[in-house]
Amino acid sequence: MNDSEEELEQQGSQEDISSSQDTSDEKEMRKQDALYAQLIEYREIVSELRRSEMKNLCIQLYCSYKAGITRRNELQSDLDGYERRIPPRLRAVWPTIHSIPDESFFDGTSASRFRQEAAYLAVRLASKKLHKLGRMASSEELPNPDGLRYLVERLQIKLERLFDSVDTFRQEQGSKSMQSRVKPMDWKILYGLARVTNGSFSSSQKADVLALGNGTRACQSLFKEMSLQPSIDIEKVSHSNPEISIEFED
């Protein structure tokens, strides 16, 4: 092998090394950009939490999923002409100040949407009950408008009391730090708060267990005794212990 061939071979190997280094550098730059974008997003989150006096962050969380997808799609296009794909695990899922919707939007639509979803739930419960009985659901056997409205109103009352108790519990935690506001609520706590009577909740695990069983029986009795009619005898679904009874009226 002459000197010219050796020089060409060395030049080719150097080009290969340089090309691999460029590819590695591009990947590293994309990763750094993704991490930097995530850092900026977390900084916005902390800034928003410090400025906001609200303890209830449900409004921000409401549209976080769609807002996160939108931000991710915006970052996929790069000026160099190739798609910059950012791994989902590198993206923050908590909403930032840019994804907070207008609160007035929920004031006019949340109640109607809730009632609509509750009505769908009542129909599904009725269909499931008929299916367990080996009967096909028909328009005559599904709840009539009055009966459906009654189910929705009862469900709304119970959920509103539960949500009020959850909010009361979070407020009584006392701390205003970000950790207590962002800390997720354990399901066991939520089950305990399900024992709701006029907005109160218990601190006794035994009472909570009894209340859950009592609530289940009350719901089953409500569905059974109602017979798809708009009226119901409340005494038939109440139990002897007044502390753990679940009311169906305000």
Swiss-Prot record:
MF terms from GO for this chain are: RNA polymerase I general transcription initiation factor activity
> Which keywords does UniProt give here?
Nucleus, Transcription, Transcription regulation
**Quick one: a GO biological-process term for this protein?**
tRNA export from nucleus
Task: Give the top-rank taxon of the lineage listed in the UniProt record for this protein.
Answer: Eukaryota
Query: Where in or outside the cell is it found?
Result: Nucleus, Nucleolus
Any GO CC annotation of this UniProt entry: RNA polymerase I upstream activating factor complex
Q: Where is this region: Disordered?
A: 1-30
How it assembles, according to the record, is:
Component of the UAF (upstream activation factor) complex. Interacts with rrn5, rrn7, rrn11 and ssp27.
Q: Which family does it belong to?
A: Belongs to the RRN9 family.
What this protein is reported to do is described as:
Component of the UAF (upstream activation factor) complex which interacts with the upstream element of the RNA polymerase I promoter and is required for the proper accumulation of rpa1/nuc1 at rDNAs. Required for nucleolar localization of condensin.
Q: What's the name of the protein?
A: RNA polymerase I-specific transcription initiation factor RRN9 homolog
Species annotation: Schizosaccharomyces pombe (strain 972 / ATCC 24843)
